[in-house]
């Protein structure tokens, strides 16, 4: 690529609307790295002959980060939607053999090509909203071959699309039918066979567990964390979504990257997260879709200074959401977060939730030039509009990978 100066833009380099530069410029060298950024009037003379790209006054933010998704799976769970509307709870559907296990059946039956095509269709709307990094979990295979298949598809998405994909092994997502009544044996399979094999194949960047009364116990979760730690892999946790099971405090003991959901999180868990540097990942899409009523403890998270990230939690059963911008709106309207909080929640804090704050979530000299240009008058509009296409252009590594067509 040619060295380029992107100019005539309003810059929000760290995802905070109170830290901006009007009439700014970003100089990107031939490697796709930011060489300089600041006010256009201060652009050094050495960049005068570089190629120019006019952004016509657009707001520019770091590329967005969707730090919690289940993007790869077979089928849908649209049939369960009517059950929910009739008052059947998520837990009851799961106990009847629906929920996660129904998606497991569809995922096991699908080949890699089918899973890739379906996941690609889910990914593309996110890319058109400025997402340049995304986490994708396994967890709908629940056997070695099927978990491998999911993680391979996630890696392929990162190779075929202009987005950085981080994979998370979520073998301990649910108990597969063939292990009914034998949860400890299944956890042994996860720890002793599945995780080591998939890690050795280079398919795992982090390890997650669903710690809930309809998922896995604290003791079982700790066994998975121990296995991940032995492999040198960071951990994260689905925690306190349906009850206060104490999973967050356990995750903090293992210095988890993040604890996610957190509707029933208590102050002791928050204090443990703060001490461990664990990010709180809130998932308003799931809260909305299954009509939860217990709000996550936003005020306590603020009080203790725990960084808060937001994510789509895209999945077929509780959050079939393909819009990180709608997630921002939900964070404000449902969780009563501020605009600065939600914007940092999908940039700087989301990157930290992946353990990649040094690579994503901010625009700084020496970093890869991943950014999004927005046709808005103020950054608050990113959380304000519902359904309006706001992203004009997405740049990844200094190359335009998306441009909205007008007319």
Curated annotation (Swiss-Prot):
First and last residue of the signal peptide: none
EC number(s) recorded for this UniProt protein: 3.5.2.7
The family this protein is said to belong to: Belongs to the metallo-dependent hydrolases superfamily. HutI family.
Binding site for 4-imidazolone-5-propanoate: 77, 140, 173, 241, 318
Pathway: Amino-acid degradation; L-histidine degradation into L-glutamate; N-formimidoyl-L-glutamate from L-histidine: step 3/3
Organism listed in the record: Burkholderia orbicola (strain MC0-3)
Binding-site residues for Fe(3+), renumbered to this chain: 68, 70, 238, 313
Keywords: Cytoplasm, Histidine metabolism, Hydrolase, Iron, Metal-binding, Zinc
MF-aspect GO terms: imidazolonepropionase activity; iron ion binding; zinc ion binding
The protein's role, per its UniProt record: Catalyzes the hydrolytic cleavage of the carbon-nitrogen bond in imidazolone-5-propanoate to yield N-formimidoyl-L-glutamate. It is the third step in the universal histidine degradation pathway.
Cofactor: Zn(2+); Fe(3+)
Top-level taxon of the source organism: Bacteria
CDD domains: Imidazolone-5PH (cd01296)
Subcellular location: Cytoplasm
InterPro entries in alphabetical order: Amidohydro-rel, HutI, Metal-dep_hydrolase_composite, Metal_Hydrolase
NCBIfam families (alphabetical): hutI
Cofactor note: Binds 1 zinc or iron ion per subunit.
Binding site for Zn(2+): 68, 70, 238, 313
Protein's name in the database: Imidazolonepropionase
Underlying gene: hutI
GO annotation (BP), single: L-histidine catabolic process to glutamate and formate
């Amino acid at each position: 690529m040619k060295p380029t100066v992107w100019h005539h833009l309003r810059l929000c380099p760290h995802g905070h609307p109170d830290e901006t530069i009007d009439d700014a410029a970003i100089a990107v060298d031939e490697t796709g790295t930011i060489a300089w950024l600041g006010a256009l009037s201060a652009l050094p003379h050495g960049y005068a002959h570089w190629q120019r790209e006019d952004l016509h006054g657009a707001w520019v933010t770091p590329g967005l980060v969707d730090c919690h998704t289940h993007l790869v799976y077979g089928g849908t769970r649209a049939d369960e939607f009517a059950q929910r509307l009739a008052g059947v709870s998520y837990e009851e559907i799961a106990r009847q053999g629906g929920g996660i296990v129904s998606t497991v059946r569809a995922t096991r039956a699908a080949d890699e090509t089918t899973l890739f095509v379906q996941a690609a269709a889910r990914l593309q709307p996110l890319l058109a909203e400025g997402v340049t990094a995304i986490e994708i979990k396994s967890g709908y295979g629940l056997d070695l071959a099927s978990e491998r298949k999911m993680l391979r598809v996630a890696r392929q998405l990162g190779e075929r699309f202009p987005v950085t994909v981080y994979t998370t092994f979520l073998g301990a997502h649910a108990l597969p039918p063939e292990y009914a009544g034998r949860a400890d044996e299944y956890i042994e399979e996860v720890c002793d066979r599945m995780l080591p094999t998939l890690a050795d194949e280079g398919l795992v960047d982090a390890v997650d567990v669903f710690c809930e009364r309809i998922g896995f116990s604290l003791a079982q979760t700790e066994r998975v964390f121990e296995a991940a730690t032995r492999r040198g892999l960071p951990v994260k946790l689905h925690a306190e979504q349906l009850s206060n099971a104490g999973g967050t405090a356990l995750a903090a003991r293992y210095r988890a990257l993040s604890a996610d959901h957190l509707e029933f999180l208590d102050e002791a868990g928050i204090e443990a997260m703060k001490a461990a540097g664990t990010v709180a990942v809130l998932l308003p899409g799931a809260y909305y879709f299954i009509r939860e009523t217990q709000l996550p403890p936003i005020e306590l998270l603020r009080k203790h200074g725990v960084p808060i990230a937001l994510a789509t939690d895209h999945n077929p059963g509780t959050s079939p959401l393909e819009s990180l911008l709608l997630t921002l709106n939900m964070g404000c309207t449902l969780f009563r977060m501020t605009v600065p909080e939600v914007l940092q929640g999908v940039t700087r804090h989301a990157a930290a939730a992946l353990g990649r704050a040094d690579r994503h979530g901010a625009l700084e000299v020496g970093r890869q030039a991943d950014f999004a240009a927005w046709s808005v008058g103020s950054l608050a509009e990113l959380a304000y509009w519902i359904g309006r296409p706001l992203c004009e252009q997405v740049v990844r590594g200094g190359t335009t990978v998306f441009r909205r067509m007008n007319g």
